[in-house]
Amino acid sequence: VRGLFVTGTDTGVGKTVLSAALMLRYPEARYWKPIQTGPDDDSTEVGRLSGGQVLDKGIRLPDPVSPHLAARLAGMTIEIPSRATDGAVYIVEGAGGVLVPLNDTQTMVDLMARFGLPVVVAARTSLGTINHTLLTVEVLRARGLRVAGVAMIGTGNADNRAAIEHYGNVAVIAEMPHFDPLTPEALRRWADTLPKDLIA
């Protein structure tokens, strides 16, 4: 399987909009969010913004809390799904950050390791992002995952970008603004600036 796994330094950082932009840049890809918690439907939003193929098979939990707790409240236990073997290209979006618990013994990075896709990290541009981003990159590399790059989301901050690239030895592949309004057209224009070689 080929593609990218989109994770973030925390929840609400902008993974879904970034995933939609990657779908626009790689129109052959299929979007999949294996685990979704809370009332927001990220899959629908990616479909609206990208017009691309969105897979709806996944675990959907109603409570807007960490996946392990949402599953417990729903009376179930999350089991990590198997990776696709069909040779298609996927943009896979995680829930929360890399160490968010899924069950009593596994976190999101265990799911990511099973899929084995290169990872794009969505990170804020604001104060605190250096530490959060470097910690995320460190965890990913400790599990043998390749970090394809970091996408910084928000008002540009050259100092934070330079620090992340220097101390993390990682490329910041994109700087994405907060879109107001967020329309498919505006996102498409920005998506055209993304690197075209992230998926080998």
Short names for language-model regions:
Residues 50, 115, 167-170:
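Short, structured coil segments at secondary-structure junctions
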Residues 6-7:
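Hydrophobic anchor at the beta1->P-loop junction of P-loop NTPases
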Residues 3, 12, 17-82, 86-88:
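N-terminal phosphate/diphosphate-binding loop that engages ATP/GTP or pyrophosphate donors
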Residues 137-200:
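C-terminal lobe/tail of nucleotide-utilizing enzymes
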Residues 103-126:
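Inter-motif core of Ras-like GTPase G domains
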Residues 31-35, 120-123, 148-154:
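Short internal beta-strands
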Residues 83-103:
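Switch II (G3) loop of P-loop NTPases
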